[in-house]
Amino acid sequence: MTTISDIYAREILDSRGNPTVEVEVFLESGGWGRAAVPSGASTGAYEAVELRDKDPKRYGGKGVLDAVNNINAIIAPELVGSDALDQREIDRQLIEMDGTPNKGKLGANAILGVSLAVAKAAADALGLPLYRYLGGVNAHTLPVPMMNILNGGKHADNNVDIQEFMVMPAGASDFASALRMGAEVFHSLKAVLQSKGLNTAVGDEGGFAPNLRSNVEAIEVLLEAIAKAGYEPGKDCFIALDPASTELYKDGKYVFAGEGVTRTSDEMVEFWASLVDKYPIISIEDGLAEDDWEGWQNLTKRLGHKVQLVGDDLFVTNTERLSRGIEMGAANAILIKVNQIGTLTETLEAIEMAKKAGYTAVVSHRSGETEDTTIADIVVAVNAGQIKTGAPSRTERVAKYNQLLRIEEELDAAALYPGLKAFYNLKK
């Protein structure tokens, strides 16, 4: 019934107008699954490799026909006849077929597309929603959204160094109310920016990218927007930051070009500590560079008890790097991006390892997204409690939020919105 009868891949476009891979898996029973693969702008050096054609005559070298061909000509013939319910075995075969440590031969974009489409086809064959198929009867926790509504760094052309300023409506009573709070703050922020004569065009992830004077001014503007929307900062709505510090790291120092300041690793720890003392900041992602392990230890000792310290470039959804971080006491949370590691199985293993160590897991989109909503189902399946999927603006972001609204409605009384309990490893 769940035997794979065909696998087909094609090249489609992502939200930035760049090509990406879409895969369809067909089962003998009529079950069917489709998955599209996202792509990042600021990528960690240790991420699994996205295969691009490098043909300058097509899409500026960013075509993915090689990855598509690897699926149709190499992967499909191997997997046709396999049982779609055997996800771990299929993912093992995909990893083995590639044979490289970073999935650089077939391409992580090829492998992930197949891995996710297989899971969706299996769920379809069983007549189950994807979150229920992946998570079983205990999948019931809706996530606190981490909404990137103000952009700097690589996601914007402005003089703000910190890449993302986010709001987290952790004081809401349910997911629908949290989404409403985030959307109202987003619209309030637009009005605040307009009143200051600032640009309200949106960036890659749906957030605004005005030319603010400093990183601190960005935080102040966000607090004003929260208050003007009728919410209390630090009670209803909290702030999360993603400085993407690896992008600022030059020759062992952190260069804040927009502010004209260079900081050492120790000075970075002090900088974050001063902001946490002054503002209702609940989460900092990539507060230090991906290779500054000692700095991460210091940051975690200093702030790990009172703020979520998320490793993104630091861990790249990789269990080997996460294991090192756990041993060293570096960070207290991991960002989970399915395309950083390249299979569903490895993604679920990273989440499990994090939870066992008392780390929180934040399931995340990429800046180059599609209408695919798989991550919304994954975050509920594993009861992660947090999702990062952009502003409540641009359809490729909103698609994930709308899927979560549907899931909350379907779960009905069984649905749990954790609020501040999503940050279970912080001392309140």
From Swiss-Prot:
Q: Which reaction does it catalyse?
A: (2R)-2-phosphoglycerate = phosphoenolpyruvate + H2O
Q: Which Pfam families is this protein grouped with? A: Enolase_C, Enolase_N
* Stored CDD domains: enolase (cd03313)
GO terms for MF = magnesium ion binding; phosphopyruvate hydratase activity
What GO terms fall under cellular component here?
cell surface; extracellular region; phosphopyruvate hydratase complex
Report residues binding Mg(2+): 242, 285, 312
Cofactor(s) this protein requires: Mg(2+)
Keywords from the named record:
Cytoplasm, Glycolysis, Lyase, Magnesium, Metal-binding, Secreted
InterPro entries, sorted: Enolase (IPR000941), Enolase-like_C_sf (IPR036849), Enolase-like_N (IPR029017), Enolase_C (IPR020810), Enolase_CS (IPR020809), Enolase_N (IPR020811)
Positions bound to (2R)-2-phosphoglycerate: 163, 337, 366-367, 388
Q: Which NCBIfam families match?
A: eno
**What protein name does the entry list?**
Enolase
